[in-house]
Regions:
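Short beta-strand/loop segment that forms part of the nucleotide-sugar
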Residues: 33-44, 64-66
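Short acidic donor-binding loop at the edge of a beta-strand
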Residues: 86-93
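Hydrophobic helical membrane-anchoring modules
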Residues: 3-4, 15-23, 55, 183-236
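Short, acidic, metal-binding catalytic loop of nucleotide-sugar glycosyltransferases
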Residues: 22-34
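A conserved acidic beta->alpha catalytic loop
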Residues: 41-50, 101-102
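Acceptor/aglycone-binding surface of glycosyltransferases and processive sugar-polymer synthases
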Residues: 66-68, 72-83, 96, 102-179, ...
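Donor nucleotide-sugar binding loop of glycosyltransferases
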Residues: 13-16, 44, 104
């Protein structure tokens, strides 16, 4: 059975992470999956804590502690770079997901099945339902439509995805991934497969979305496509 690396960025969300890890462990045991798990601690204010224990399905578990808070996108970029340089993770395709429970862990099974049957550079999980406030949904829709208007690209997914290990170099040789991981996928990889999954509620706590974070996210995404936007502006 092929071994996969699961990459989980986390900032203070240790309670939710622990519940997610328990579900991942159950899925691994049920399907006889083999996982390495890398948790990226984005300089949390609370001491990292988890009850997960290694077993025949969870072969390796590591917490990568960052010395300063980088935000989830840069934390993911740093972690992918770490995987690229560390021989323990060589040739292990990477499953990236958020740690708060909104990414449904049962979808991991669908990602792995598609990875076996379909040739892809990456498999992304498109959200079929968002549980954020109306104002967020409206502004996010505006963001997506403006992005499509200026670039011709649609991004209907977040971090939840499966990335082929051999395609890491395609992402790391440009700065896109440090701005926005989903946008970097669209801008640098050719064979992108898609599956759909309902976005769940957080296991506990309130959503951290706010206007500033949405604006910051939108700015990062647009920065990835700046050359396309520049060309569009000249000719249209």
């Amino acid at each position: 059975m092929k071994v996969y690396t699961i990459l989980l960025p986390v900032y203070n969300d240790w309670k939710n992470l622990d519940k997610l890890l328990s579900k991942i462990s159950y899925i691994a045991k049920k399907n006889n999956f083999k996982f390495y798990i890398l948790v990226v601690n984005d300089c949390s204010k609370f001491k990292p804590k988890t009850n997960l224990k290694k077993n025949k399905n969870i072969i390796k578990f590591k917490i990568l502690n960052l010395s300063q808070n980088m935000g989830s996108q840069r934390a993911i970029a740093l972690a992918i770079n770490h995987l690229k340089k560390n021989s323990d993770y060589k040739n292990k395709d990477i499953i990236i997901m958020d740690a708060d429970g909104q990414d449904d862990p049962s979808t991991i099974t669908d990602l792995i099945k598609m990875n076996i049957t379909k040739v892809s550079d990456a498999i992304v999980v498109e959200r079929t339902n968002r549980r954020e406030p109306f104002w967020f949904k409206f502004l996010y829709l505006v963001h997506k439509n403006v992005l499509f208007l200026f670039t011709g690209n649609q991004i209907r997914f977040g971090n939840f995805s499966l990335l082929k290990f051999k395609k890491i170099k395609n992402l790391m040789h440009k700065s896109d991934i440090w701005a926005a991981y989903p946008a970097a996928i669209v801008n640098n990889l050719n064979k992108i497969s898609r599956i759909k999954s309902e976005r769940k509620r957080r296991y506990s706590g309130n959503s951290k979305v706010n206007l500033y974070k949405l604006f910051n996210h939108s700015s990062r995404v647009f920065s990835v496509f700046k050359y396309k936007i520049f060309i569009f502006s000249i000719f249209y």
